[in-house]
Amino acid sequence: MELRHLRYFVAVGDALNFGRAALALHIAQPPLSRAIRALEAELGATLFDRGTRGVRLTGAGAALLPEARRLLRDAEAFREGARQYAAGAAGTLSIGFVS
């Protein structure tokens, strides 16, 4: 599973529209649809009901959307921690004073 697929899932889940999600992600709609289908195949669950009246989250999609958001937040926190560590900004700082 790729983080990119989770980002795409969250974008479509928020917009409930593949075209608007694609615009927000700065990608074309067909690759977005393919990525969502690949994610659904990998998970073995349909995330969206696609119909003539638009897109709706399935039960699985509604249950997994908050988890996808959490995973993306955790990945960003990990990435930021790694950047700080690489820059020497991470570590323990102990400060004491004498009165």
Language-model segment annotations:
Residues M1-A35, G51, V55, L64:
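N-terminal short secondary-structure element
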